[in-house]
Amino acid sequence: KMFYPQAKPNVIHEKMALFAKEKNACVITQNVDGLHSKAGTPQNDLVEFHGSLYRVFCQKCGRSIEWSKYLEDMHHEGCGGILRTDIVLYEEPIRREVLERAVEIVSNADLIVVCGTSLAVYPFAGLIEYASKDAKIVAVNKEKIPLPENAELIIGDAKEVFEEVDLKK
C-alpha cells in the first residue's frame, strides 16, 4: 500500500510551510508523500524532487488523472493506457526542469536548511554543491552527514529541533 491520504504533516512540514509563506523560502523535498503540500507550502515554492504519489498520469496519452482513480483501476478509462504515479523510480532520471529549478533555488539561497537526509544519493546530494560561498548551511540529522566545511550540523531529532524554531526571530 503506497497511499496514506490520512497521513498528517508534522511540525517540520508545518514550519517549512510557514517559512515559505512568511520568509520567502522554498522547499526542496525528496519525499513523495505530499505532506509539504498538505501543510500549506505554496506550489510555486515547492520542488518535489522525486515527484508525488498524488499526481497520476496516463502513460499512453499523457493526461493527468485524479489519484483516487488510480486506486480504482490502473487503466485510463479514456484511452485504455496504463496509469502511473508521477514519481521517480530507482535508476530513472530526475526530470530536467525539476533539477534546474532545484539548482536555481540552492544557488540563490542565503540560508539552506538540510533535514532528514543522508546526503548520500545523487543527484539530490549534489545540490548542496551549488550553494553560494556566502550561504549559511544548517543541517539537522540524527547522525553525522557529509557537509561543506562552512556548514553547521545539529545532531538530534529534527521534530524536536523544529518545535523550538521561532519564526518571529
Set out the residue ranges of the language-model regions.
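Conserved catalytic alpha/beta core of Sir2/sirtuin-type deacylases, generalized to analogous enzyme cores
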Residues: 1-169
